[in-house]
UniProtKB/Swiss-Prot annotation:
This is Uncharacterized membrane protein YuiD. Keywords: Cell membrane, Membrane, Transmembrane, Transmembrane helix. It is found in: Cell membrane. GO terms for cellular component: plasma membrane. It comes from the Bacteria. Its main location: membrane.
Amino acid sequence: MELLTNFPLLSSLAAIIFAQVIKVPIQFIVSRKLDWSLVTSTGGMPSSHSAAVTALSTGVALEHGLDSSLFAVSAIFAVITMFDATGVRRHAGEQATVINKLVIDFNRFVNEAKDFPKAAEKEKQKKLKELLGHQPIEVFFGGLTGILLTLVLAYFFM
């Protein structure tokens, strides 16, 4: 089956898995807290999106050359993805932080204004996910992860 021998695809998937798994020990080193939920979460160091798109572009470059149209498409796709990770998604995460604080402050105000006996209802309120985007350094190391991992895989499998 050709899908199972598609080097750019496989290197991109390997980069996603590697970047997601490596987030756990990196966060442990920084915070001394073991958080396995990072394996399936967005945001954090390194950016798995950046690792994936740079691995894809590197794999395409190795297979088809830097002068191919396919590389041009994958490179532009990578740039847009990494720009989005540091721009729109990061700002959405910052907005989620502010909105969550507003909800907490509003609930505190309501509780102080009157005796609010519905604690169970308050606990059911959904918080917005705040870790959506990436700091530029996370995107940089995600991209570097994708490139280096693909070069290592190419050495062994191409």
